[in-house]
Amino acid sequence: MLKRISCILLCVLMLACTLVLASCNGGEDDSKAQVSVDGDTAGFLPESKHWGGETVNILTYAKDSYTFSDAEIDPEELIDEPVNDAFYERNALILEKYGIDIVGCFPESGEDYIAMLRNDMTSGLNEYDVICASIAYVAPLATEGLLYDFNDIGNGYIHTEKEWWDQTLVRDTAINGNIYFISGDAIVLDDEATWAIFFNKDLVSTYNLDDPYQIVRDGNWNFDTMHELIQKVDLMHGSTKSYDPAVGDQWGMVVQSYDFLLFMQGAGQTLVDNTGETPKFRIDDQRNIQVFTKFTNMVYDEQNVGIADRMGYWADMYVNEGKIFENGNALFMPNSISIVNGEGLRNAEIHYGLLPMPKADELQDEYTTSVNVYRYPVFAIPTSNVTKLDATCYALEAMAYYGKQLVTEEYYDRTLTYKRFQDDDSREMLDLIFRNRSYDLGTIFNFNNGGGDGSLYFYTKLIGQLSTDIVSTYEAQKDNYNAGLSEFIEQCYAE
């Protein structure tokens, strides 16, 4: 505790010094985000309030789960790492200015944080004021009535319509008009869990390909254009293309089964339509069928596209997939943004860039992308939080507001753009990717009857046979999926 208090005092002193230096430097530019403890609050809550040292306990991932999983909630100290230190400064500012101490509650590795929250609620201990964890695991709590609807809290301390909260998450995951999950600039793991296309710049040069960045800017980045580029990268050392990284065969693209779902979502095709009075499956919608047919025309090109799941034991082949790209032998590889922090890409001797997921075709207006629901974190407040509800909402709003001011640029510029991608084009692509995500209730809730694979795994069922028969595959699963959806509607949409 003494170490924690000392570090916070040190950080507050540093913030004060930053103000003095800023005035002495006559406004000279500084690459590190500058913080004003007494000012720069325009746009934050009109009622500035001091909470007298109130603690807000946030249950989240184990510290070693992901890069930044400890730093984004409650970093222990300043460690000369830009993102960690920006989060630390944010929390110190909130404590000094508003009297709220953000305390991370980190499970041990392998410990079930959802079970911890349930036990906390049923025991009456009420230790956890908010949970920040993967949406796929948090979501069922909403159907059980264990989470607050942010629309219904009514204390005026949290504003889900503000730009520091992910507006498409609010839109796409509204359940009967209720908002149970929020995410945004309070954290960075939401961005880390976002899907994109990694591409090899060296192969673009070697094969004299059109500039992928310009294709995106021109609005022409779609399945057909991507397939044309994929077909131009083809090197084989034997009679058949090898998925062994040591062989050195070159692929236009390497993928795995989960990518199918993310390609379809990037093409604007969700499993569930959540725009009507109640959600409904749209897998057999004619547009969805057309887009999947176009997608499989590209991804089932076995000469140029290597699907890891078809090459052997999936876990081993997923490793091979990554190594093929890292070795410089694949033009494209879809994956989450988080892999830039992994040892493989950090040590890879290739020049790579980043692109949004491709559109389906010219009929699609905007680029969009989605996330890995097993890693995408959201904030939710358990209904057991009564006495500290106001302080919790105030803290979350402050975390997001000051996260946008202090952390987002550090994460974008220092960690992603220049430390990992090292070009201005990738920053442009990151802006494009992050500003237009979409979310699908069919993946988040994985609807099923409790006895089989859920809707999240629909496209996986087609891979084994390289099938394009979406209609009959859906017919075989329709009752299973709709049983889960019907139960969901009964729980959440009953009058």
Residue ranges and their predicted role:
Residues 227-230, 270-315:
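Glycine-centered hinge/linker elements that transmit conformational signals in sensory
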Residues 59-62, 125-131, 135, 175-197, ...:
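Extracytoplasmic/periplasmic solute-binding protein
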Residues 152-164, 216, 244, 269-290, ...:
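Short, solvent-exposed loop/beta-turn-alpha elements that line the ligand-binding surface or hinge
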Residues 38-54, 61, 108-111, 136-195:
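Hinge/lid segment of periplasmic solute-binding proteins
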Residues 383-393, 403-495:
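Conserved C-terminal helix/tail region of periplasmic/extracytoplasmic solute-binding proteins
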